[in-house]
UniProtKB/Swiss-Prot annotation:
The protein's name: ATP synthase subunit alpha, mitochondrial
UniProt record similarity statement: Belongs to the ATPase alpha/beta chains family.
Gene Ontology CC annotations of this record: mitochondrial inner membrane; proton-transporting ATP synthase complex
Lineage: Eukaryota, Amoebozoa, Evosea, Eumycetozoa, Dictyostelia
Subcellular location: Mitochondrion; Mitochondrion inner membrane
PROSITE patterns, A to Z: ATPASE_ALPHA_BETA
Record function comment: Mitochondrial membrane ATP synthase (F(1)F(0) ATP synthase or Complex V) produces ATP from ADP in the presence of a proton gradient across the membrane which is generated by electron transport complexes of the respiratory chain. F-type ATPases consist of two structural domains, F(1) - containing the extramembraneous catalytic core, and F(0) - containing the membrane proton channel, linked together by a central stalk and a peripheral stalk. During catalysis, ATP synthesis in the catalytic domain of F(1) is coupled via a rotary mechanism of the central stalk subunits to proton translocation.
SUPFAM superfamilies: C-terminal domain of alpha and beta subunits of F1 ATP synthase, N-terminal domain of alpha and beta subunits of F1 ATP synthase, P-loop containing nucleoside triphosphate hydrolases
Pfam family, one: ATP-synt_ab
Residues noted as binding ATP in the record, renumbered to the chain: G188, D189, R190, Q191, T192, G193, K194, S195
UniProt keyword terms in alphabetical order: ATP synthesis, ATP-binding, CF(1), Hydrogen ion transport, Ion transport, Membrane, Mitochondrion, Mitochondrion inner membrane, Nucleotide-binding, Transport
């Protein structure tokens, strides 16, 4: 149309129009053939580098999130900013070897890692390489190369959560049931026992070992990670666990990539029809790492200086946790993201984002922790949106009454400090509430089998513990558990109680257990 307008304006004869049109097409074809974009767009050159971020020219057709290699430096990076004349790239490693003029090569793919069953019992870095000194990981027939950025399972591939994911923590399994394929946020201030609940859940899978556990340490101290690995090894849980580590001394891009690497490993087992549990410890540090990268890339800051897409980096990660249906192997990936709050403020930007993404949250309070209530779970602010759909028949029956009793206790406990003239009913509710809280206390790294959990909840709902002094409750609980373990028939029943399809709260075996112990 432009050529026709020019011809009309210059009064060129109509008969010569076709000749000019053919000539124009030829010139355009030659120009397109020799344009700089098509001569070479696979290599670029570093223009400048600062604080782990480089500007590169020449990579005109690179895609966002694409992996690049710094030629001859044994370093990789990822393209995050696509600008008119340059590309903003973050470096995965130390930037001391990078300088102006270094050649950058496109890898024409996103970051990918090799995943296999041989990773079980190992400690790996963000790139999937072992860092535990136990030798290299060898490829096998089942080894798969998987991109760390993968699409979440679609709607038709999913199935509703209905299988229980037992944590071994009485308070969680009874009041906040978690299912396989669920995303349950663990949130609270620093030093309130967030990681302890997640680690207990890993230790509790030792009973049947049908769940592969992945622990992702984001921005943690090396000494903390070492203690965790040693504890898992001592308890015999490391053999079914994979630890993905990006410590506080690692560059921000490595801390940013760590959860996606761990999720990819979990998806490998989920797609094989197995069940996996992944712990992200913690996503607050993950968000801070992404904020650091974004500010260095000169992206516009938003609320609390986080970039506008900080919600998306967490939603696309957590949506990958799912329960698949029969057509896709019935596998599941359960996620326990951990978020740290400041002075109990759950209305901050990152906590509210992740609360809106997940299927419930376990809220831990500093005040409860300081009172000696461990785990320091605030049952009123905590919720599991899956509910009793993922609970066994036994726990469903027993926990229903427990929730009501605790709700009544919380309501009356507020007024207890203002008035000492309570009636007999109120006094009884307060006494039973204190007893229940005492029995729900549990030490770290000591998960309890579901049968024993059910027995203790049954015992606290009857008169066996009612007349005990609160200071003696924990000791009496230990004696009862020891007695059940010593009687083979009781121990066998407790071991298979989770499989019971129908349960009567006045079950004769549970009653017999308690009566036999009292005698």
């Amino acid at each position: 149309m432009q050529l026709e307008r020019i011809l009309t304006e210059t009064n060129i004869e109509r008969s010569k129009f076709k000749q000019y049109k053919v000539l124009s097409k030829y010139i355009n074809a030659v120009a397109k053939k020799y344009t700089l974009n098509n001569v070479s767009n696979k290599y670029g050159k570093v223009l400048f580098i600062k604080d782990g971020v480089v500007k590169v020219s020449g990579l005109s057709q690179i895609k966002i999130g694409e992996k690049v290699e710094f030629v001859g430096k044994n370093l990789f990076g990822m393209a995050l900013n696509l600008e008119a004349t340059s590309v903003g790239i973050v470096i995965f490693g130390e930037d001391t070897a990078i300088y102006e003029g270094v050649i950058v090569k496109r890898c024409e793919q996103n970051f990918a890692i090799k995943v296999d069953k041989t990773m079980l019992g190992r400690v790996v870095d963000v790139l999937g390489q072992p860092i535990d000194g136990l030798g290299e990981l060898k490829d096998t027939k089942t080894t798969r190369v998987m991109s760390v950025e993968r699409k979440a399972p679609g709607i038709v591939t999913r199935k509703s959560v209905h299988e229980s994911m037992l944590t071994g923590v009485k308070m969680v399994d009874a009041l906040l049931p978690i299912g396989r394929g669920q995303r349950e946020l663990i949130i609270g201030d620093r030093q309130t026992g967030k990681s302890a609940i997640a680690v207990d859940a890993i230790l509790n899978q030792q009973v049947n070992k049908d769940i592969v556990c992945i622990y992702v340490a984001v921005g943690q101290k090396k000494s903390t990670v070492r203690r965790l690995v040693e504890m898992l090894n001592t308890k015999g849980a490391l053999e079914y666990t994979i630890v993905v580590v990006s410590t506080a001394s690692d560059a921000a891009p490595l801390q940013f990539l760590a959860p996606y690497t761990g999720c990819t490993i979990g998806e490998y087992f989920r797609d094989e029809g197995k069940h996996a549990l992944i712990v992200y410890d913690d996503l607050s540090k993950h968000a801070v790492a992404y904020r650091q990268m974004s500010l260095l890339l000169r992206r516009p800051p938003g609320r609390e200086a986080y970039p506008g897409d900080v919600f998306y980096i967490h939603s696309r990660l957590l949506e990958r946790a799912a329960k698949l249906n029969e057509k896709y192997g019935c596998g599941s990936l359960t996620a326990f993201p951990i978020v740290e709050t400041q002075a109990g403020d759950v209305s901050a930007y990152i906590p509210t984002n992740i609360i809106s993404i997940t299927d419930g949250q376990i809220f831990l309070e500093k005040e409860l922790f300081n009172k000696g209530i461990r785990p320091a779970v605030n049952v009123g602010l905590s919720v599991s949106r899956v509910g009793s759909a993922a609970q066994s028949a036994v726990m469903k029956k027993l926990a229903g009454a427990l929730k009501l009793e605790l709700a009544q206790y919380r309501e009356l406990a507020r007024f207890e400090q203002f008035s000492s003239n309570a009636d007999a009913v109120t006094t009884q509710i307060l006494k039973k509430g204190k007893l229940t809280i005492e029995l729900l206390k549990q030490v770290n790294n000591n998960p309890m089998a579901v049968g024993m959990e059910a027995l203790m909840i049954f015992a606290m709902s009857t008169s066996y513990f009612q007349n005990l002094d609160l200071s003696l409750v924990r000791a009496e609980e230990a004696k009862l558990l020891q007695y059940i373990h010593s009687v083979s028939s009781f121990k066998l029943y407790a071991a298979c109680v989770d499989a019971v399809k129908a349960f009567n709260p006045k079950d004769t075996v549970f009653t017999e257990m308690c009566q036999s112990y009292v005698k």
